[in-house]
Regions:
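A Zn2+-metalloprotease active-site environment signal
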Residues: 3-9, 20-271
C-alpha cells in the first residue's frame, strides 16, 4: 500500500508539471508541444535582445548580397504565411514582423530569434553559393520561428527546474531516504541534460524538415539541400557526434533530408 501511495504521489507531481500550459501542434509535422511561455512574453524578451544585437552588429556593405538575403527571405515568409492562413493557422504568426539582415561576420552561420528576426552572416554565402541553397538555410531558420522552438526550449527548462524541486519534495514526503533522494535528483539532472540536448537535436531535425517544405512552397528546388549540406559538412571542423550535441550528424542530417524529399517535391512540383 505504501509503495502504491508513493507511486501515486510521484505520478501526480509529474502530471502537475506536464498538465499546465498551452498545447499546440507544430505546422507541417503535426507534433504536439506543451508551451508554458506565451508569444507575448517571449516576443517582448527576444525583441529587446535583437535590438541590442543589431545595434552592435555591422551590417554588410555588399548591397547585392544584402538585397538577395532580403528578397529570398521575404519570398519564403510570404509563402509560409499564405500556407498558414490557408490552413487556419495564421494566428500563430500574426504578431511576427519578418526581418532578414546580412551582417559582417566570417562565421558560417545564421540564426533566428522568435517573431521572425533572422540574421545571416556573410561568411555563410560562399557555402550557399546560390539563392536556392540560401532558401534552404532561411527556410530552416523560419521553421524555428514558426515551430516556436525557443518558447518550447524555455518551457522545458521550467519543467526541468521545477521537476528537480518536486522530486526532492515528493521523495521526502513519501518517506524515501535522503541518500536515495540525492541519488534520484542526480540521476534526473543527468537525464534532463541528455534529454534537453536530445530535444535540441530533435528541434534541429524538425527545422530541417519544415524548412525543406517551406523552401519548396516558395518555389525553390528542395533537391539542392543535399549538396548544400554536403558543402556545409566539408566546411565544418570535426565530424564526430556526441550525445550532448545540439545538431544531428552531417550524415544523419543528409539521410533525413533525402527521406523527406518526396514530400517536399510535391510542394515544389505544384508551383
Amino acid at each position: 500500500m505504501m509503495r502504491s501511495i508513493k507511486s501515486f504521489i510521484v505520478a501526480a507531481a509529474a502530471a502537475l508539471l506536464v498538465g499546465c500550459g498551452t498545447t499546440t501542434h507544430v505546422p507541417v509535422t503535426g507534433r504536439k508541444q506543451n508551451l508554458l511561455v506565451s508569444d507575448q512574453q517571449i516576443l517582448s524578451l527576444s525583441g529587446q535582445q535583437y535590438k541590442e544585437y543589431m545595434q552592435k552588429a555591422k551590417p554588410s556593405s555588399n548591397a547585392a548580397q544584402t538585397a538577395m538575403v532580403k528578397r529570398v527571405g521575404q519570398r519564403l515568409a510570404t509563402a509560409v504565411v499564405n500556407y498558414l492562413n490557408a490552413n487556419g493557422l495564421g494566428s500563430e504568426v500574426a504578431n511576427y514582423q519578418w526581418e532578414f539582415n546580412l551582417v559582417e561576420n566570417k562565421s558560417v552561420n545564421a540564426f533566428c530569434m522568435p517573431g521572425g528576426k533572422i540574421v545571416v552572416y556573410d561568411g555563410l554565402l560562399p557555402v550557399t553559393q546560390d539563392e536556392a541553397s540560401l532558401a534552404i538555410v532561411l527556410g530552416h531558420e523560419i521553421a524555428h520561428a514558426v515551430a516556436k522552438h525557443s518558447a518550447e526550449r524555455m518551457s522545458n527548462a521550467y519543467k526541468q527546474q521545477y521537476g528537480m524541486s518536486i522530486l526532492s519534495g515528493v521523495a521526502s514526503a513519501a518517506g524515501v531516504s535522503s541518500d536515495l533522494t540525492q541519488l534520484g535528483t542526480a540521476a534526473l539532472g543527468v537525464g534532463a541534460e541528455a534529454w534537453s540536448s536530445g530535444f535540441s537535436r530533435s528541434q534541429e531535425s524538425e527545422a530541417d524538415h519544415i524548412g525543406l517544405i517551406f523552401a519548396a512552397m516558395a518555389g525553390y528546388d528542395p533537391r539542392v539541400a543535399v549538396t548544400f549540406w554536403q558543402r556545409m559538412a566539408a566546411a565544418s571542423t570535426g565530424g564526430g557526434s556526441s550525445i550532448f550535441s545540439d545538431h544531428p550528424s552531417d550524415a544523419k542530417r543528409i539521410k533525413q533530408i533525402q527521406g523527406w524529399m518526396p514530400e517536399a517535391l510535391k510542394y515544389y512540383k505544384g508551383k
